[in-house]
Amino acid sequence: MKKHKEYSSLDLSKIGEEILSFWNNNSVFDKSIADPLRPENFTFYEGPPSANGMPGIHHVIARTIKDLFCRYKTLKGYTVNRKAGWDTHGLPVELGVEKEMGLTKEDIGTKISIEDYNKACRVNVMKYKKSWEEITSQMGYWVDMKNPYVTYDNKYIESVWWLLKQLHEKKLLYKGHTIQPFSPKAGTGLSTHELNQPGCYKNVKDTSAVAQFQIIKDEKSQFLFEKTNQ
């Protein structure tokens, strides 16, 4: 008896649908992480996507690479738990909501309550959740979508605080000073990723005012002439 089905023609879409159907109907992924004969764990952390943006081909490529490692470790006898997650922290979410509602940061707490503003952000940040779930299933990416972690959830935030406490107690955190890009409009610092958002930089023309004064060279003004050609 043949273990695997043979195909006379390569209709890749049809073959893919049949394999996905077999995996789903037989709960293959669930069985692979619940097998008692797999006592050793391989730890895998799923970097969460942001569900307020549509999935793209680069996400498919990255997930394919991650899936290869997880499936290989599964074949080697490891239990490979992989929990899905949603990245919900980020300035782009806030700016998107403010643009849709015609608000500025100054309007929060006056024209709109903080509670309503937060609700709008929670809705916006999960805007394309269904699209992500569909493409995850279609590409056969094995990850636990039933019990995802959500970064705005208090349990997740508390776990991050706990980790920071551990770092602090081990004296791995220190206070320092560094120059960071800042957005006056948003009232917050900007990450490298946020600096690459469309519309962050614009070429503008401005008028510079230059005033000239005569300087008398004496002891009081001597510092102005130091290390110059005078």
Question: Residue locations for each model-derived region?
Answer:
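N-terminal, positively charged nucleic-acid-binding surface of large information/translation enzymes
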Residues: M1-Q230
